[in-house]
Protein backbone atom coordinates (compact mmCIF):
# COMPACT_ATOMS: atom_id res chain seq x y z
CA UNK A 1 0.00 0.00 0.00
CA UNK A 2 1.65 3.22 -1.18
CA UNK A 3 0.01 5.40 1.46
CA UNK A 4 -1.30 4.28 4.84
CA UNK A 5 -5.10 4.29 4.74
CA UNK A 6 -7.77 4.61 7.40
CA UNK A 7 -10.55 2.07 7.74
CA UNK A 8 -13.53 2.59 10.01
CA UNK A 9 -15.03 -0.19 12.12
CA UNK A 10 -18.47 -0.37 13.74
CA UNK A 11 -18.62 -3.02 16.50
CA UNK A 12 -22.39 -3.49 16.11
CA UNK A 13 -24.71 -4.49 18.95
CA UNK A 14 -22.97 -3.36 22.18
CA UNK A 15 -24.35 -6.26 24.25
CA UNK A 16 -23.12 -8.83 21.74
CA UNK A 17 -19.69 -10.13 20.75
CA UNK A 18 -18.89 -7.24 18.42
CA UNK A 19 -16.96 -5.26 21.06
CA UNK A 20 -15.13 -8.45 22.11
CA UNK A 21 -14.01 -9.03 18.53
CA UNK A 22 -12.86 -5.44 18.05
CA UNK A 23 -10.75 -5.68 21.22
CA UNK A 24 -9.27 -8.92 19.85
CA UNK A 25 -8.46 -7.20 16.55
CA UNK A 26 -6.44 -4.68 18.55
CA UNK A 27 -4.10 -7.40 19.81
CA UNK A 28 -2.13 -7.42 16.55
CA UNK A 29 -0.48 -4.87 14.29
CA UNK A 30 -2.26 -3.70 11.15
CA UNK A 31 -0.91 -1.90 8.05
CA UNK A 32 -3.86 0.51 8.18
CA UNK A 33 -5.21 2.79 10.89
CA UNK A 34 -8.21 1.20 12.60
CA UNK A 35 -10.73 3.90 13.51
CA UNK A 36 -13.47 2.45 15.71
CA UNK A 37 -16.78 4.29 15.87
CA UNK A 38 -17.94 3.39 19.36
CA UNK A 39 -18.34 4.40 22.98
CA UNK A 40 -14.97 4.57 24.75
CA UNK A 41 -16.11 2.98 27.99
CA UNK A 42 -17.78 0.13 26.13
CA UNK A 43 -14.43 -0.85 24.63
CA UNK A 44 -12.32 -0.37 27.76
CA UNK A 45 -14.82 -2.22 29.95
CA UNK A 46 -14.95 -5.13 27.51
CA UNK A 47 -11.17 -5.25 27.26
CA UNK A 48 -10.93 -5.38 31.06
CA UNK A 49 -13.54 -8.14 31.19
CA UNK A 50 -11.54 -10.15 28.65
CA UNK A 51 -8.23 -9.41 30.37
CA UNK A 52 -6.74 -7.89 27.22
CA UNK A 53 -4.63 -4.72 26.97
CA UNK A 54 -6.19 -1.79 25.12
CA UNK A 55 -5.20 1.84 24.72
CA UNK A 56 -7.57 4.17 22.88
CA UNK A 57 -5.88 6.80 20.73
CA UNK A 58 -7.64 10.04 19.75
CA UNK A 59 -8.85 10.27 16.18
CA UNK A 60 -7.02 13.08 14.36
CA UNK A 61 -8.44 13.36 10.83
CA UNK A 62 -6.14 16.25 9.95
CA UNK A 63 -3.00 14.19 10.60
CA UNK A 64 -1.64 11.47 8.29
CA UNK A 65 -2.87 7.96 9.00
CA UNK A 66 -0.45 5.59 10.75
CA UNK A 67 -0.35 1.79 10.88
CA UNK A 68 -2.12 0.52 13.99
CA UNK A 69 0.15 -0.72 16.77
CA UNK A 70 -0.76 -3.85 18.73
CA UNK A 71 -2.76 -3.10 21.86
CA UNK A 72 -4.26 0.11 20.46
CA UNK A 73 -7.30 1.36 18.58
CA UNK A 74 -8.07 4.82 17.25
CA UNK A 75 -11.37 6.02 18.72
CA UNK A 76 -14.07 7.99 16.91
CA UNK A 77 -16.32 8.54 19.94
CA UNK A 78 -20.05 7.87 19.79
CA UNK A 79 -21.91 7.87 23.09
CA UNK A 80 -24.05 4.99 24.31
CA UNK A 81 -27.65 5.80 25.19
CA UNK A 82 -27.67 3.43 28.21
CA UNK A 83 -25.21 1.31 30.22
CA UNK A 84 -24.34 -2.06 28.69
CA UNK A 85 -24.40 -5.49 30.31
CA UNK A 86 -22.88 -8.14 28.03
CA UNK A 87 -25.56 -10.52 26.82
CA UNK A 88 -28.50 -8.27 27.74
CA UNK A 89 -30.17 -6.24 24.99
CA UNK A 90 -31.28 -2.68 25.68
CA UNK A 91 -33.81 -0.98 23.42
CA UNK A 92 -32.29 2.37 24.41
CA UNK A 93 -29.08 1.46 22.58
CA UNK A 94 -30.81 0.64 19.31
CA UNK A 95 -30.36 4.24 18.21
CA UNK A 96 -26.70 4.15 19.30
CA UNK A 97 -26.01 1.35 16.84
CA UNK A 98 -27.60 3.33 14.02
CA UNK A 99 -25.60 6.42 15.06
CA UNK A 100 -22.35 4.49 14.60
CA UNK A 101 -23.41 3.20 11.19
CA UNK A 102 -24.45 6.65 10.01
CA UNK A 103 -21.20 8.30 11.12
CA UNK A 104 -19.06 5.59 9.55
CA UNK A 105 -21.01 5.65 6.29
CA UNK A 106 -20.84 9.44 6.05
CA UNK A 107 -17.09 9.34 6.64
CA UNK A 108 -16.66 6.90 3.76
CA UNK A 109 -18.82 9.01 1.46
CA UNK A 110 -16.70 12.07 2.28
CA UNK A 111 -13.43 10.25 1.58
CA UNK A 112 -12.44 10.22 5.25
CA UNK A 113 -12.07 6.42 5.30
CA UNK A 114 -10.97 3.96 2.62
CA UNK A 115 -13.26 1.15 3.78
CA UNK A 116 -15.91 0.22 6.35
CA UNK A 117 -15.98 -3.06 8.28
CA UNK A 118 -19.11 -3.81 10.29
CA UNK A 119 -19.70 -6.03 13.28
CA UNK A 120 -23.00 -7.88 13.86
CA UNK A 121 -26.15 -5.95 14.76
CA UNK A 122 -29.44 -7.08 16.29
CA UNK A 123 -32.16 -5.99 13.87
CA UNK A 124 -34.96 -6.65 16.32
CA UNK A 125 -33.74 -4.30 19.03
CA UNK A 126 -33.10 -1.52 16.49
CA UNK A 127 -36.67 -1.81 15.22
CA UNK A 128 -37.96 -2.00 18.80
CA UNK A 129 -36.21 1.34 19.36
CA UNK A 130 -38.47 2.85 16.69
CA UNK A 131 -35.88 2.87 13.91
CA UNK A 132 -37.01 1.01 10.76
CA UNK A 133 -34.06 -1.24 9.91
CA UNK A 134 -33.90 -4.19 7.51
CA UNK A 135 -30.14 -4.65 7.60
CA UNK A 136 -26.73 -3.11 6.95
CA UNK A 137 -26.99 -3.57 3.20
CA UNK A 138 -30.27 -1.70 2.84
CA UNK A 139 -29.17 0.99 5.31
CA UNK A 140 -25.99 1.83 3.40
CA UNK A 141 -27.82 1.66 0.07
CA UNK A 142 -30.31 4.30 1.23
CA UNK A 143 -27.82 6.55 3.02
CA UNK A 144 -25.36 6.58 0.12
CA UNK A 145 -28.19 7.01 -2.40
CA UNK A 146 -26.78 4.10 -4.39
CA UNK A 147 -28.95 3.13 -7.33
CA UNK A 148 -28.69 -0.56 -6.48
CA UNK A 149 -26.49 -2.73 -4.26
CA UNK A 150 -25.72 -6.44 -4.36
CA UNK A 151 -25.04 -8.70 -1.40
CA UNK A 152 -22.13 -11.11 -1.79
CA UNK A 153 -20.62 -13.55 0.70
CA UNK A 154 -17.12 -14.88 0.17
CA UNK A 155 -14.57 -17.26 1.59
CA UNK A 156 -11.07 -17.86 0.28
CA UNK A 157 -12.46 -20.51 -2.08
CA UNK A 158 -15.93 -19.26 -3.07
CA UNK A 159 -17.85 -16.05 -3.83
CA UNK A 160 -21.66 -16.12 -3.92
CA UNK A 161 -23.71 -13.05 -4.88
CA UNK A 162 -27.49 -12.83 -4.58
CA UNK A 163 -30.01 -11.59 -7.13
CA UNK A 164 -32.54 -11.16 -4.30
CA UNK A 165 -31.84 -10.99 -0.58
CA UNK A 166 -34.33 -10.95 2.28
CA UNK A 167 -37.53 -11.83 0.42
CA UNK A 168 -40.13 -14.46 1.30
CA UNK A 169 -39.67 -17.43 -1.02
CA UNK A 170 -43.12 -16.93 -2.56
CA UNK A 171 -42.04 -13.45 -3.75
CA UNK A 172 -38.76 -14.46 -5.40
CA UNK A 173 -40.05 -15.54 -8.83
CA UNK A 174 -41.88 -12.26 -9.38
CA UNK A 175 -38.77 -10.32 -8.33
CA UNK A 176 -36.53 -12.00 -10.93
CA UNK A 177 -37.03 -9.61 -13.85
CA UNK A 178 -34.82 -8.80 -16.84
CA UNK A 179 -34.17 -5.33 -15.42
CA UNK A 180 -33.09 -6.76 -12.05
CA UNK A 181 -30.74 -9.32 -13.59
CA UNK A 182 -29.15 -6.79 -15.95
CA UNK A 183 -28.50 -4.50 -12.99
CA UNK A 184 -27.26 -7.14 -10.54
CA UNK A 185 -24.96 -8.89 -13.01
CA UNK A 186 -23.63 -5.52 -14.18
CA UNK A 187 -22.73 -4.50 -10.63
CA UNK A 188 -21.22 -7.91 -9.85
CA UNK A 189 -19.10 -7.86 -13.00
CA UNK A 190 -17.98 -4.25 -12.43
CA UNK A 191 -16.95 -4.77 -8.80
CA UNK A 192 -15.17 -8.05 -9.50
CA UNK A 193 -13.04 -6.09 -11.95
CA UNK A 194 -12.50 -2.90 -9.95
CA UNK A 195 -12.50 -4.08 -6.32
CA UNK A 196 -11.20 -7.62 -6.73
CA UNK A 197 -8.73 -6.97 -9.55
CA UNK A 198 -10.16 -9.59 -11.93
CA UNK A 199 -9.65 -8.42 -15.51
CA UNK A 200 -12.17 -10.78 -17.12
CA UNK A 201 -14.31 -12.40 -14.41
CA UNK A 202 -16.21 -15.62 -15.10
CA UNK A 203 -19.61 -15.75 -13.39
CA UNK A 204 -21.76 -18.88 -12.94
CA UNK A 205 -25.48 -18.08 -12.88
CA UNK A 206 -27.94 -20.36 -11.09
CA UNK A 207 -31.33 -21.16 -12.51
CA UNK A 208 -34.37 -20.32 -10.41
CA UNK A 209 -36.20 -23.64 -10.57
CA UNK A 210 -35.12 -27.22 -9.81
CA UNK A 211 -32.88 -28.53 -12.60
CA UNK A 212 -32.84 -24.96 -13.98
CA UNK A 213 -36.41 -25.51 -15.17
CA UNK A 214 -35.79 -28.82 -16.98
CA UNK A 215 -36.42 -27.25 -20.38
CA UNK A 216 -39.57 -25.50 -19.19
CA UNK A 217 -41.17 -28.52 -17.51
CA UNK A 218 -40.41 -27.24 -13.98
CA UNK A 219 -40.92 -23.55 -14.56
CA UNK A 220 -40.27 -21.16 -17.43
CA UNK A 221 -38.34 -18.35 -15.72
CA UNK A 222 -35.08 -19.64 -17.17
CA UNK A 223 -36.42 -19.62 -20.74
CA UNK A 224 -38.45 -16.42 -20.44
CA UNK A 225 -36.12 -14.28 -18.32
CA UNK A 226 -32.69 -15.60 -17.40
CA UNK A 227 -31.47 -16.96 -20.75
CA UNK A 228 -32.31 -13.80 -22.76
CA UNK A 229 -30.52 -11.61 -20.20
CA UNK A 230 -27.42 -13.81 -20.23
CA UNK A 231 -27.38 -13.84 -24.04
CA UNK A 232 -27.58 -10.05 -24.10
CA UNK A 233 -24.77 -9.61 -21.56
CA UNK A 234 -22.56 -12.17 -23.29
CA UNK A 235 -22.94 -10.12 -26.46
CA UNK A 236 -21.52 -7.20 -24.45
CA UNK A 237 -18.41 -9.25 -23.62
CA UNK A 238 -19.22 -10.72 -20.20
CA UNK A 239 -18.15 -14.31 -19.44
CA UNK A 240 -21.31 -15.91 -18.06
CA UNK A 241 -22.24 -19.58 -17.72
CA UNK A 242 -25.80 -20.66 -17.07
CA UNK A 243 -28.46 -20.88 -16.07
CA UNK A 244 -27.10 -23.90 -14.22
CA UNK A 245 -28.94 -26.18 -11.75
CA UNK A 246 -28.01 -25.06 -8.24
CA UNK A 247 -27.89 -28.64 -6.93
CA UNK A 248 -24.96 -29.53 -9.22
CA UNK A 249 -23.27 -26.16 -9.74
CA UNK A 250 -21.34 -26.17 -6.44
CA UNK A 251 -18.67 -28.71 -7.39
CA UNK A 252 -15.07 -28.37 -8.56
CA UNK A 253 -16.05 -29.17 -12.17
CA UNK A 254 -17.62 -25.71 -12.33
CA UNK A 255 -16.13 -23.75 -9.44
CA UNK A 256 -12.50 -24.36 -10.40
CA UNK A 257 -13.03 -22.25 -13.51
CA UNK A 258 -15.21 -19.49 -12.04
CA UNK A 259 -14.71 -16.29 -10.07
CA UNK A 260 -18.21 -15.97 -8.58
CA UNK A 261 -21.64 -17.57 -8.45
CA UNK A 262 -24.88 -15.63 -8.78
CA UNK A 263 -27.71 -17.30 -6.83
CA UNK A 264 -31.29 -16.25 -7.45
CA UNK A 265 -32.25 -16.16 -3.77
CA UNK A 266 -30.76 -16.20 -0.28
CA UNK A 267 -31.11 -19.87 0.67
CA UNK A 268 -30.13 -21.15 -2.77
CA UNK A 269 -26.49 -20.11 -2.50
CA UNK A 270 -25.60 -19.26 1.07
CA UNK A 271 -26.10 -22.65 2.80
CA UNK A 272 -23.36 -24.13 0.62
CA UNK A 273 -20.96 -21.29 1.34
CA UNK A 274 -21.65 -21.31 5.07
CA UNK A 275 -21.26 -25.07 5.30
CA UNK A 276 -17.98 -24.83 3.43
CA UNK A 277 -16.54 -21.94 5.40
CA UNK A 278 -18.61 -20.83 8.38
CA UNK A 279 -16.61 -18.49 10.57
CA UNK A 280 -14.28 -17.68 7.68
CA UNK A 281 -16.83 -15.93 5.47
CA UNK A 282 -17.15 -12.26 4.69
CA UNK A 283 -20.24 -10.28 3.69
CA UNK A 284 -19.48 -7.69 0.99
CA UNK A 285 -21.84 -5.00 -0.29
CA UNK A 286 -21.26 -4.42 -4.00
CA UNK A 287 -22.49 -1.31 -5.78
CA UNK A 288 -21.71 1.15 -2.98
CA UNK A 289 -19.42 4.11 -3.70
CA UNK A 290 -17.06 2.74 -1.01
CA UNK A 291 -15.73 -0.61 0.21
CA UNK A 292 -17.84 -2.35 2.85
CA UNK A 293 -17.19 -5.78 4.35
CA UNK A 294 -18.68 -7.50 7.36
CA UNK A 295 -18.58 -10.63 9.47
CA UNK A 296 -20.82 -13.51 8.41
CA UNK A 297 -22.29 -14.26 11.86
CA UNK A 298 -24.66 -12.77 14.39
CA UNK A 299 -24.40 -11.08 17.76
CA UNK A 300 -23.97 -14.31 19.82
CA UNK A 301 -25.23 -12.63 22.98
CA UNK A 302 -24.54 -15.75 25.04
CA UNK A 303 -20.80 -15.44 24.33
CA UNK A 304 -20.40 -11.71 24.98
CA UNK A 305 -17.74 -10.87 27.54
CA UNK A 306 -16.75 -14.52 28.07
CA UNK A 307 -13.60 -14.67 25.96
CA UNK A 308 -15.07 -17.43 23.78
CA UNK A 309 -15.89 -15.48 20.61
CA UNK A 310 -13.97 -16.43 17.46
CA UNK A 311 -12.44 -13.37 15.78
CA UNK A 312 -11.70 -15.26 12.54
CA UNK A 313 -14.47 -13.80 10.40
CA UNK A 314 -13.65 -10.23 11.52
CA UNK A 315 -9.96 -10.73 10.68
CA UNK A 316 -10.93 -12.11 7.27
CA UNK A 317 -13.29 -9.18 6.65
CA UNK A 318 -10.58 -6.67 7.53
CA UNK A 319 -7.92 -8.42 5.45
CA UNK A 320 -10.26 -8.55 2.46
CA UNK A 321 -11.06 -4.85 2.81
CA UNK A 322 -7.32 -4.09 2.81
CA UNK A 323 -6.86 -6.14 -0.38
CA UNK A 324 -9.77 -4.32 -2.01
CA UNK A 325 -8.24 -0.96 -1.07
CA UNK A 326 -5.02 -1.99 -2.82
CA UNK A 327 -6.96 -3.12 -5.90
CA UNK A 328 -8.73 0.23 -6.19
CA UNK A 329 -5.62 2.40 -5.81
UniProtKB/Swiss-Prot annotation:
Its main location: cytoplasm. Keywords: Cobalt, Cytoplasm, Magnesium, Metal-binding, NAD, NADP, Oxidoreductase, Pyridoxine biosynthesis, Zinc. Its EC number is 1.1.1.262. GO terms for molecular function: 4-hydroxythreonine-4-phosphate dehydrogenase activity; cobalt ion binding; magnesium ion binding; NAD binding; zinc ion binding. Binds 1 divalent metal cation per subunit. Can use ions such as Zn(2+), Mg(2+) or Co(2+). Its cofactor is Zn(2+); Mg(2+); Co(2+). Substrate binds at residues 136-137, 274, 283, 292. It catalyses: 4-(phosphooxy)-L-threonine + NAD(+) = 3-amino-2-oxopropyl phosphate + CO2 + NADH. One of its GO terms (cellular component) is cytoplasm. It holds the Pfam family PdxA. It is found in: Cytoplasm. It comes from the Bacteria. It is an enzyme of class 1 (oxidoreductase). GO terms for biological process: pyridoxal phosphate biosynthetic process; pyridoxine biosynthetic process. Pathway: Cofactor biosynthesis; pyridoxine 5'-phosphate biosynthesis; pyridoxine 5'-phosphate from D-erythrose 4-phosphate: step 4/5. The active site is located at the dimer interface. Belongs to the PdxA family. Catalyzes the NAD(P)-dependent oxidation of 4-(phosphooxy)-L-threonine (HTP) into 2-amino-3-oxo-4-(phosphooxy)butyric acid which spontaneously decarboxylates to form 3-amino-2-oxopropyl phosphate (AHAP). This is 4-hydroxythreonine-4-phosphate dehydrogenase.
